[in-house]
Structures are given as C-alpha cells and as structure tokens.
Amino acid sequence: MAKLTKRMRNIREKVEVTKQYEIAEAVALLKELATAKFVESVDVAVNLGIDARKSDQNVRGATVLPHGTGRSVRVAVFAQGANAEAAKEAGAELVGMDDLAAKVKAGEMDFDVVIASPDAMRVVGQLGQILGPRGLMPNPKVGTVTPNVAEAVKNAKAGQVRYRNDKNGIIHTTIGKVVSTKHKLKENLEALLVALKKAKPSAAKGVYIKKVSLSTTMGAGVAIDQASLSATV
C-alpha cells in the first residue's frame, strides 16, 4: 500500500467524510488545509437529481458570480464591423474573423473564452474540431454566441462561470480562490445554486440539488449543509 503523504494524513484527520459542514466552517477548513505552493481554486461539485442519459434533463448554462472567480480571463471574439469595435472597447484581447481563425488553426490559442456574433459562426464552424475538445466552442446556450458581444465580453471578464452536467449528473465548476473571504465564497456559491435551480429541467422529478461539495485544487471534498446557505437558494 502506498504511503500517505503528510498532507493527505492531515486531510484525513481533519475532514469527516460523512459530515455536512455549515458553509462558514467548510470554507475555514478548506483554507486551513490549502497548503500548496500556489493559490488554489475553490471548486464545487453539485449532484443533481436528473437522469443525464436523457437529453431533456441535461443542465447547461452560465452565470456571473457576484465576486468573480479570482482569475484573469483572456477573451477572443469572432466579429466584424461595429461588433468588432464594441468587443475591443469591452476589453477583448483578440478580435477578428478569418485572420483570427487562421491563428487558431496555427495553434495560437492564448485565450480562455471564445465569443462569436451569429454572423461569424460561418467562420467559427470550421474550428469545431479544435475548439470543441477544449470546451471553447461558442454556444448560444451559455451566451457565447450572441449579437451583443460587448456584454458577453464584460460578463466573461466579470467572472462568469459556465456549467454543464457530466454523465453522472454532476456539475463541476469553480467559485473563486482560497484567498477569497468566506463571505465572497458563500455568496458566489449561492449565486451558482440559484442559477442551477432556474435551469432545472421540467422533466426532472424529486430532489433536484441532492448534494453540494467544496474542495480546493489539491484538497479533499467537503460536503455542505444546504441549510446554512441563504434562504433564497
């Protein structure tokens, strides 16, 4: 049997796997256990009461967290004319059409989010095999194919997170950095859960949000007592 590292022993000693922690206690514990040499992210896993095998029960969307994610985001926009100018003014790092597509095909992909105006999809459509596997393909369901590219750029810069359930019906995303305050992480989590509830498929029956867990990049998962969150969630 592999020998446990000091870090893993510490996590095992302090995290009760069967306990549901109040949000403040959970965040305090995550901060205590975040000992990596880099600033760890605080990630969330939300188990949904859906049948992920059925297309009408899949959950996908995006929401802007009130306190952002704590990371800087580089945005590429496929647009032309007035939309291109609006994207630049909103802070997009890369803006173009065929010229930008050529850079992507050449492997120049120094960006985290791709946004496109509807008329640019004829160009973006050629990049599906490159952008798709990386989760970068623009999609109207998450607001990255839109006539209002400036607003989409601002949302991306403001800390918008995109979510999509996996084959087990679990949403995985981030709600900030471990250096964020308890208050900010709590409000970001609540905002995400509100968005997920609004996105609940009509075909989903029974308990919708079954379990919420937080973890840091290098840490163990901590289950959250949903009763400790805002009543609006």
Curated annotation (Swiss-Prot):
GO molecular function, one term: tRNA binding
One Gene Ontology cellular component annotation held by this UniProt entry: cytosolic large ribosomal subunit
Top-level division of the source organism's lineage: Bacteria
Keyword rRNA processing: no
Keyword tRNA-binding: yes
Gene3D superfamilies attached to this UniProt entry: 3.30.190.20, 3.40.50.790
One BP term from GO: regulation of translation
PROSITE patterns linked: RIBOSOMAL_L1
Keywords noted in UniProt: Repressor, Ribonucleoprotein, Ribosomal protein, RNA-binding, rRNA-binding, Translation regulation, tRNA-binding
Family classification: Belongs to the universal ribosomal protein uL1 family.
The protein's name in its UniProt record: Large ribosomal subunit protein uL1
